[in-house]
Amino acid sequence: MSPPRVSRSWLARTATAAAAGIAMWAAFPPRNWWFLAVLGLGLLFAALFVGAPRARTGAWVGFVFGLAFFVPLLPWIGVYVGPLPWLALAAILAGYLALFGAIATVTMRLPVPPVWFTVSWVLVEALRSAFPFGGFPWGRTAFSQVDGPLLPLASVLGAPGLSAGVALFGSSVAWLLVVLVRAYRRTSTGTTWTPIPDSEGPVLPERSSGVVRIATTAVAIALLAPIAAIAATPASLDRNIATTSARIGAVQGNVPRLGLDFNAQRRAVLDNHVRTTMAYGGAIDSGQTEQPDFVLWPENASDISPLDNADAAAEITAASEAVDAPILVGTLIHNPDGRPTNSVLVWDGARGPVARYDKHIVQPFGEYLPWRPFFRLFSSYADMAGDFRPGTGPTVVDVPGRSGTVTVGVATCWEVAFDRAARQSVREGAQMLFVPTNNATFGRTEMTYQQLAMSQVRAVEHGRAVVVAATSGVSAVIEPDGSISRQSGVFTSDVLTGRLPLHDDMTLATRLGPWPEVLAIIAAVAGLLFALRSRTRFSLRPRRVAARATGDTKELDGIGD
């Protein structure tokens, strides 16, 4: 006995959702197959649109997509703490995609479904990037596009706009194909169209042609939008427009060992960075490389605070004198309230610390542990989490360079995933961005490459050069167009040098700030409320009537599964 049609439809949707999630994962670094994100969201659109499934089916489709995407994306979470945190986080994030599936299924019954698919996608990405515990933006669609032609959208509408561009492109192409296939089937079967009163919403040939035109227009807009973005903000993509520049050296000193306890040898980590910087100073003295305006060390380069430890201060001073330039030092500072801050000190060999930045967005389950007594029940690693205090004040530091003071925006490690971090720095006058990071606790996983892509998006979003200094790799020098001009390996010592353009202008994305995302969220919520209030009868009834008029039994069977 053959299985019921609904069961076959459910299995087909499930398989399509799983394939879509895997395609989305493959779009992310280190593969960078950006086009698979477009394909993945196109498949997800088809799974949620064809046959007009119920909201609960849409939720299931979204959940399957989320699992197929996040499970292979995030294994670095559990590389040293076991699979439970990794799989639990993947399941929670898949829950957000289940919410998306339910919302999109309902709102896509409104006219021009790709628009509602897109704004619903932006809504749910915003939700999981903010809640709970400050959110988890990892895996945002925008971060899969560093090698793709849609990347310039970030300079106009920010990272949320880039995510929206991918969603609109994929869903519009899928919608156009669905419409064309339906039109072909009706034509090939020689269907005779029976007039139906307009109040019932007939799907007449003229209306079908109109839908094709709308779908084609949506695809064209999605393709032309990046070109318009380049025209709107040429400075953000031209590395030669800046009138001033600074020569930098980014030091990757490496760590003595991998794992969660890499920093048990804090002095060895500091010594590694001092030794590598001293060698850099020797190369400068011998004329092998040019004198830098300043040098950048990564996060945790000196977890022995030079403000409290005279030996650490002396080592950093000696390194600064060796290169005859200030060093931006990633360190931990112990505060009077007993809670440390993850800080960057601008250390001048002659004057000591001249500026300081304390990390504003501290990482849950790493730098602090919410609900500590509760999570202690599930993992023996819970007590290894810190109790860091979030920083306040400016997100920029003024660095005295050889050619004048340079205003550097700092987004330490985890912070680069959040839109507000880099945006605040640029609005406060940052001429370039600095991302000190420590990825040693994640071993040789894909995490470091996924994070590097975030810095590339930020470069384009704000039209700024970005320097990523990593304790153990990957360190990189990123141009304002998002391209990587220099890059280190992992678990090796290295020094990356280069002259970076310094920009004072702002891209449209920086000026607009969060407003494009806010408007998309408002549109998604309004569309959902309108669709729920209308109980979707205006959408489903015309399709039932038209299907009965044309004798399309497959269409009738597919509606509402």
Language-model-derived ranges and their functions:
Residues 2-234, 443-444, 455-458, 470-472, ...:
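Membrane-embedded alpha-helical bundles of multi-pass enzymes
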Residues 28-45, 69-72, 252-253, 289-304, ...:
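Short, conserved active-site loops that position catalytic residues or coordinate cofactors/metal ions
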Residues 77-84, 130-159, 318-321, 341-423, ...:
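Active-site catalytic loop in hydrolytic enzyme cores
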Residues 80, 84, 118-119, 302, ...:
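CN hydrolase (nitrilase-like) catalytic-core segments centered on the catalytic cysteine
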Residues 89, 93, 262-270, 445-448:
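Flexible, glycine- and charge-enriched loops at secondary-structure boundaries
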Residues 232-365, 396-404, 410, 414, ...:
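Soluble catalytic regions of membrane-associated enzymes that act on cell-envelope
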